[in-house]
């Protein structure tokens, strides 16, 4: 699943190419792509048609579009947002209407500048759904996102509160980093990269880390995400692309993730791979010593 940098790359593309455009006909060709919209495909299409895209927004790994009604005296806002679930392979592409339709393009929304917003999803784990907006800690977010914490790139991210929340958890620090209700946007790749940069083993208990150590870790989370964002995100296959169909290249700079048995870029020790929460963790045994068993 895309993590914060990859989703932010898509959000920026939508903000540039889709915000301000009026939605025309919406064509839905695969029912799974709208399965989260319980009112059905016809309802989703009808409620989007004729609306102007107001903004593309994000919290953590969650992405949504807001709308208003063009021509209304107060630019009346639609009381729901289009939540975009990218899943494992979802792509939001902006294409000329005359461009060949991609094999797995399950939703196509015509825009008033002659382009189309296309949702392409090979594995069909993702989809679109309209959801009511709710006010949470001073911001309007879709109800399915209401439980998600702010992410390290959010201007209103309160690092000291997050430090306290992390240290209150009696779980492995990597598990806590992946908890989207504590801090959002971090997935397996950037958790491993941030922990390596901070010199912390992911199996250490969060409650046993000092405040300075957690502050350092959060600073590294932010730093690695900004670097990944500048590189267009991490693309391990052709399924992650931006709205123009281009892949990111941050995988070239990864220090530990996916580098089993390769030398640590800092000390030269072979990177190790371990099982963790039905996935893999990568770390340097020398730079990130395992916690001692009591």
From Swiss-Prot:
Protein name: Formamidopyrimidine-DNA glycosylase
The encoding gene: mutM
Active site positions: 2 (schiff-base intermediate with dna), 3 (proton donor), 61 (proton donor), 279 (proton donor)
Phylogenetic placement of the source organism: Bacteria, Bacillati, Actinomycetota, Actinomycetes, Mycobacteriales
E.C. code: 3.2.2.23, 4.2.99.18
InterPro entries the record matches: DNA_glyclase/AP_lyase_DNA-bd, Formamido-pyr_DNA_Glyclase, FPG_cat, MutM-like_N-ter, Ribosomal_uS13-like_H2TH, Znf_DNA_glyclase/AP_lyase, Znf_FPG/IleRS
Residue intervals of every FPG-type zinc finger in the record: 255-289
Keyword NAD: no
Amino-acid positions noted as binding DNA in the UniProt annotation, renumbered to this chain: 104, 123, 169
PANTHER family assigned to the protein according to its UniProt record, in alphabetical order: FORMAMIDOPYRIMIDINE-DNA GLYCOSYLASE
The species this protein was found in: Nocardia farcinica (strain IFM 10152)
């Amino acid at each position: 699943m895309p993590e914060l940098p990859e989703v932010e790359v898509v959000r920026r593309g939508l903000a540039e190419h889709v915000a301000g455009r009026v939605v025309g006909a919406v064509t839905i060709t695969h029912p799974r792509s709208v399965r989260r919209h319980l009112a059905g495909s016809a309802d989703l299409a009808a409620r989007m048609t004729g609306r102007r895209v107001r903004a593309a927004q994000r919290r953590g790994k969650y992405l949504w579009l807001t709308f208003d009604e063009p021509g209304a005296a107060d630019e009346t806002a639609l009381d729901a947002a289009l939540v975009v679930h990218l899943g494992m392979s979802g792509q939001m592409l902006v294409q000329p209407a005359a461009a060949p339709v991609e094999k797995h393009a399950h939703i196509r929304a015509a825009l008033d500048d002659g382009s189309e917003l296309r949702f392409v999803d090979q594995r069909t784990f993702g989809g679109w759904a309209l959801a009511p907006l709710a006010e949470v800690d001073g911001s309007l977010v879709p109800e399915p996102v209401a439980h998600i914490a702010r992410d390290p790139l959010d201007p209103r991210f309160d690092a000291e509160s997050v430090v306290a929340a992390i240290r209150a958890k009696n779980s492995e620090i990597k598990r806590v980093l992946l908890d989207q209700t504590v801090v959002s946007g971090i997935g397996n790749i950037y958790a491993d990269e941030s922990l390596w940069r901070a010199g912390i083993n992911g199996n250490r208990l969060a409650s046993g880390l000092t405040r300075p150590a957690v502050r350092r870790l959060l600073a590294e989370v932010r730093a690695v995400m900004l670097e990944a964002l500048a590189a267009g995100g991490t693309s391990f296959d052709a399924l992650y692309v931006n709205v123009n169909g281009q892949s990111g290249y941050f995988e070239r700079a990864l220090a530990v993730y996916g580098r089993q048995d390769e030398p640590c870029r800092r000390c030269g020790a072979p990177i190790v791979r371990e099982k963790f929460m039905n996935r893999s963790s990568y770390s340097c045994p020398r730079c990130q010593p395992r916690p001692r068993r009591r």
